[in-house]
Amino acid sequence: MTDIRKMKGKERLVKEYDQLTNDPDINNCFGIDYWDPDADNPDITHWQITLIPPVGTDYEGGFYKIEAKFLEDYPISAPQMKFVTRIYHCNIAENTGHICLNSIKDDWKPSLIMEDVLNHIMILLYKQNPSSPLNDNAAELYRKENKTEFLAKVKEYSKKYANINDYENLKKQDIHLLANCKCIWCQIIFRYKGSF
């Protein structure tokens, strides 16, 4: 890969990061930051994404961390993404956090941007696909007509692994903003929730 192509990929990442972090319609349900293992050397190719699903969803009350890594040939190759926070979901591997999502696998196109990917992840939280599971146990419970047992497991994981009160660095006003998000994504999903 040429240095020019690598530079273009990083320029695009910076542009996407700036757009995502400055757009109030997005920034209310996702907090996005560079991964910063070394405070002196932040890395634009490694993002930490915070997701707080809106009130009224199965994952309400959870505080989820997602990791995104971008290879040198991004956007030719898809971002490598996984949930860092354990989550009980048909399409998310319980122990590794890997996500079964076509838009970051077989259907990836360089024309997709991170806003699209985050939108797809948000929709995946509302509309699971038990016919393509990474968590067979979750898929089995999800397929049952009465989802009480599945929802109890979701809440158990949310309380145990995604408890918002465990994150001291999150300000109370941020919690209120995120948990009551009125962004276009959340509004679209609420409007069409019954038709998914």
Show which residues each predicted segment covers.
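UBC/E2-like fold recognition across ubiquitin and ubiquitin-like conjugation systems
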Residues: 1-63, 67-196
